[in-house]
From Swiss-Prot:
Disulfide bonds: none annotated. This is Protein hook. PROSITE patterns: CH. Belongs to the hook family. It is found in: Cytoplasm, Cytoskeleton; Endosome; Synapse. The keyword Cytoplasm applies. GO terms for molecular function: dynein light intermediate chain binding; microtubule binding; small GTPase binding. Its main location: cytoplasm. The coiled coil domain mediates homodimerization. Residues 1-155 are annotated as: Interaction with microtubules. Residues 135-437, 480-574 form a coiled coil. The lineage of its organism: Eukaryota, Metazoa, Ecdysozoa, Arthropoda, Hexapoda. Disruption phenotype: Life span reduction.
Length: 679
C-alpha cells in the first residue's frame, strides 16, 4: 500500500495541532525553527527535556536565519535520540536520520515528516501516553490510519524490547477496541506482511553467510590435510622449514595456526548456532505472523459479515419504521372509521326524528291554515276598534278642553254675579234669584253632560276587552304573518298615543299660561284640580305607552325566534333532499350494475314520473319519498326474481343429462321468489 505524497506529514501535522503550545505550530515554516517541537517534548517528558534544556532553544530573533534554525534542530534531534536510547531503550540505527539542513533552509516536508514521527514516538511512550493515545483515537479514521502506519514504521526499527511491549502493540490494542474497521485491519496486515518479507530477507542472508563459512572451513581442512602429507614445507622466504616434529619451529607454527583455526571454527560454529537460533526464532515469528495474518483475515471477514448484518438490520429497521408508521395511520383510520360509524348512527337517529318533526309540522301547518281566516277577521276587528278608540280619545280631549273653557267662563260669571248681588236692591232679589236659578240649572245640565262625556268607563272596558282578545289571539296564533301585522298595529298605536301625549302636554302648558294671566287668587284651586286631572291622564297614557312598547318588543323577539327556527328547518330540509338524491343515485348505480335493461327501464319510468309530477300539483315530500322507495323496492324484487328464474333454468339444463347422484352433488339453486315473499 503506497500512501499518497506527504499524506503522513499532513496527518502528523493535524495531530500536532491538537497540542496546547505557546509557539505557533500550524504549518511547516512555524515548525522549522524547532521551538514548537522543543515545547512539545518538554510537555511530554519534563524530567528528560527539562526547562533548562528548553531555555537553550533560541525562540526569539530566529526569523529567516537558517543557521539559528539549524542549531535549534540539532539540539532537538540530539535530545530525541538520547531519549530513545537512554530512556526508551530504542536503537534508531535503521531509522534514517532527518536532514536538518533541508528543514532549516527549504522547510522540506519529507524530512519534517520523519522528525514529527520521532516526536510522535516520544508522545506515545511517555508517562501520560494514554491521554495522547485517546486524543489520537478521537481524530478521523484516515488520520488515525496514517498515524498508526508511522508508529509501525518506527516500531520496525526497534532493536531492544521495553517493559510495555511496544507502542504499536499498545496502540493496536487500543485500536482493536476503538478502531475495529476493515481499513485498520488491512493496514495491520500489510505491515505484518512487510515484516515477514524483511525477516525472510534476513534469513536468506544468514543462510548465505552459513554456506560461505562452511566453504571456508572445508578449504581450511583441505589445506591442513595437504600440509600434513608433505614432509618438507618451504616458507614464505623460500627456506625449508624441515619435517613436522614436536618441538620444532614448524610444529609450533602449525600448532599455533591450528589453534587459531580451531578458535575461528568455534566462533563460526557459535555464529552458526546463533544463526540457527535466530532462524528458528524468525521461523516461529513467521509462523506467528502468518497466524496473525490469518486471524486478521478472519477478523476482516467477520467485520465484513458484521457490516452486512448491520446493513440488513438497518434495512429491516427502516422497514419496521415504515410498517409502524403505516400501522399508526391504519389505527387512526380505524378510529376515524369508528367515529364515522357513530356519526352515521347519530345522523340516522336525527333523520328519523326530523322525519317525525316534518310530519308534525305538516299537521300543524294544516291546522294553522284553518285558523288563518279567523286571525285575519280578528285583525280587521282590532283595527276597527283601534280606529274607534283613537276617534273617541280625540273627542274626549276636545270635550275636556271645551269643559275647561266653560268652567273658566262660569267662574267669571259667578264673580260678576257676586258683584251684582251686592249692588242690587232688595227689589230685584226675586229676579236675580230666578236668573240665578236658571243659570244654576244651565250649569247643572252642562255639568251632567260633561261628566257623562268625561266618564271613560265604557271606553276603558271596551279597550280592556279588546286587549284581552288581542292577547288571546297572540297566544293562540302561531303564524309569522299574524305576529308581524300585530306588531305593526302596536307600533301605530304607540305613535298615536305619543301624538295624544304631545297634545295633552301642549294643553297643560296653555292652561298654565292662561292661569298665570288671570287672577291667581280666585282660579288657583280650580286650575289645580284641572292640572291634577290632566297629570293623572298623562300618567295613564304613559303607562299605556310603556305597555304597548313592551308588547311590541316581545312580539319582535317572537318574530325573530320564529324566523330563526324557520331558516334552520329549511336548511335541514335542504340537507335531507341532498341525502335523498345521493341515495337515489346510488340505487340507480346498483340497479345498473345488476342489469342495464332494468336500469334503462327504471330511468324511463323515473322520467315519466318526474313529468307527471311536474304536470300535477306539488305533493308533500314524504309521499314523494315513499313512492320512490316503493319503485326502487319493486325493481329490486323484479331483478331478484329474474335471477332466481335463470338459476333454476340453468340447474334444470345442467341436471338433465346426469345421474341421480350427480344431480345430488350439484349446488342447489338460489331461493325461490315464494320463499323470499314468505320472508
Amino acid at each position: 500500500m503506497s500512501a499518497p505524497k506527504n499524506e503522513m506529514y499532513y496527518s502528523l501535522l493535524e495531530w500536532f495541532k491538537t497540542l496546547n503550545l505557546n509557539a505557533p505550530h500550524a504549518d511547516a515554516e512555524s515548525l522549522a525553527d524547532g521551538v514548537a517541537l522543543a515545547q512539545a517534548l518538554n510537555q511530554f517528558a519534563p524530567e528528560s527535556f527539562t526547562d533548562a534544556w528548553l531555555s537553550k532553544i533560541k525562540a526569539s530573533a530566529v526569523g529567516s536565519n537558517w543557521r539559528l534554525r539549524m542549531s535549534n534542530l540539532k539540539k532537538v534531534t540530539q535530545s530525541v535520540y538520547d531519549y530513545y536510547s537512554d530512556v526508551l531503550n530504542y536503537s534508531l540505527s535503521d531509522f534514517s536520520k532527518p536532514d536538518l539542513q533541508r528543514i532549516a533552509e527549504k522547510c522540506d516536508l519529507g524530512e519534517l515528516e520523519r522528525l514529527l514521527q520521532l516526536v510522535l514516538g516520544c508522545a506515545v511512550n511517555c508517562a501520560e501516553k494514554q491521554s495522547y493515545i485517546t486524543e489520537i483515537m478521537c481524530l478521523e479514521e484516515e488520520l488515525q490510519a496514517n498515524i498508526m502506519r508511522a508508529l509501525q514504521e518506527l516500531e520496525a526499527t526497534r532493536q531492544a524490547s521495553t517493559p510495555e511491549g511496544g507502542v504499536a502493540s499498545s496502540l493496536s490494542r487500543g485500536s482493536r477496541t476503538g478502531l475495529l474497521d476493515s481499513k485498520a485491519v488491512q493496514e495491520d496486515r500489510d505491515a505484518l506482511a512487510q515484516k515477514c518479507f524483511e525477516t525472510e530477507k534476513k534469513m536468506l542472508l544468514l543462510i548465505d553467510e552459513k554456506t560461505n563459512l562452511q566453504q571456508e572451513l572445508h578449504k581450511l581442512q583441505q589445506e591442513f590435510a595437504r600440509l600434513e602429507q608433505h614432509s618438507t614445507v618451504i616458507g614464505d622466504d623460500g627456506v625449508s622449514l624441515g619435517p613436522v616434529q614436536t618441538g620444532s619451529v614448524r610444529y609450533n607454527e602449525l600448532r599455533r595456526q591450528l589453534d587459531l583455526l580451531k578458535e575461528e571454527l568455534l566462533q563460526s560454529e557459535g555464529a552458526r548456532e546463533d544463526l540457527k537460533i535466530k532462524a528458528q526464532q524468525q521461523d516461529t515469528d513467521l509462523l506467528h505472523m502468518q497466524m496473525r495474518i490469518e486471524e486478521l483475515m478472519k477478523s476482516s471477514a467477520e467485520v465484513t459479515t458484521l457490516k452486512d448484518e448491520v446493513d440488513v438490520l438497518r434495512e429491516s429497521n427502516d422497514k419496521l419504521k415504515i410498517c409502524e408508521a403505516q400501522l399508526d395511520t391504519y389505527k387512526k383510520k380505524l378510529e376515524d372509521y369508528n367515529d364515522l360509524k357513530k356519526q352515521v348512527k347519530i345522523l340516522e337517529e336525527r333523520s328519523a326524528d326530523y322525519v317525525q318533526q316534518n310530519a308534525q309540522f305538516e299537521e300543524d301547518a294544516k291546522r294553522y291554515a284553518n285558523t288563518k281566516g279567523q286571525v285575519e277577521l280578528f285583525k280587521k276587528e282590532i283595527q276597527d276598534l283601534h280606529a274607534k278608540l283613537d276617534a273617541e280619545s280625540s273627542k274626549n280631549v276636545k270635550l275636556e278642553f271645551d269643559n275647561k273653557n266653560l268652567e273658566s267662563k262660569n267662574l267669571a260669571l259667578q264673580r260678576a254675579k257676586d258683584s251684582l248681588l251686592k249692588e242690587r236692591d232688595n227689589l230685584r232679589e226675586a229676579v236675580d234669584e230666578l236668573k240665578c236659578g236658571q243659570l244654576s240649572s244651565n250649569t247643572a245640565l252642562t255639568g251632567t253632560t260633561v261628566s257623562r262625556e268625561l266618564q271613560p268607563s265604557a271606553t276603558v272596558e271596551k279597550l280592556q276587552r279588546l286587549e284581552a282578545e288581542n292577547k288571546a289571539l297572540r297566544e293562540g296564533q302561531g303564524g309569522q304573518t299574524a305576529l308581524a301585522q300585530l306588531l305593526d298595529d302596536a307600533n301605530k298605536r304607540c305613535e298615536n298615543l305619543r301624538e295624544q301625549l304631545k297634545t295633552a302636554n301642549e294643553r297643560i302648558l296653555s292652561l298654565s299660561h292662561a292661569s298665570q294671566s288671570d287672577d291667581p287668587i280666585l282660579k288657583e284651586s280650580e286650575f289645580g284640580k284641572q292640572i291634577k286631572q290632566l297629570m293623572e291622564l298623562n300618567e295613564q297614557k304613559t303607562l299605556q305607552l310603556e305597555e304597548a312598547v313592551t308588547q311590541s318588543t316581545s312580539l319582535q323577539c317572537k318574530v325573530t325566534q320564529l324566523e330563526t327556527n324557520l331558516s334552520a328547518r329549511e336548511q335541514e330540509i335542504l340537507v335531507y333532499d341532498a341525502k335523498y338524491r345521493k341515495c337515489v343515485e346510488k340505487a340507480k348505480e346498483v340497479i345498473k350494475s345488476i342489469d342495464p335493461r332494468i336500469a334503462s327501464a327504471l330511468d324511463a319510468s323515473v322520467l315519466e314520473k318526474s313529468a307527471d309530477l311536474v304536470e300535477e300539483e306539488p305533493k308533500p315530500k314524504m309521499s314523494v319519498m315513499e313512492e320512490q322507495l316503493m319503485t326502487s323496492a319493486f325493481y329490486r324484487l323484479g331483478v331478484n326474481a329474474q335471477r332466481d328464474a335463470i338459476d333454476s333454468k340453468l340447474a334444470i339444463l345442467m341436471g338433465s343429462g346426469q345421474t341421480f347422484l350427480a344431480r345430488q352433488r350439484q349446488s342447489a339453486p338460489r331461493k325461490s321468489l315464494s320463499a323470499m315473499k314468505s320472508k
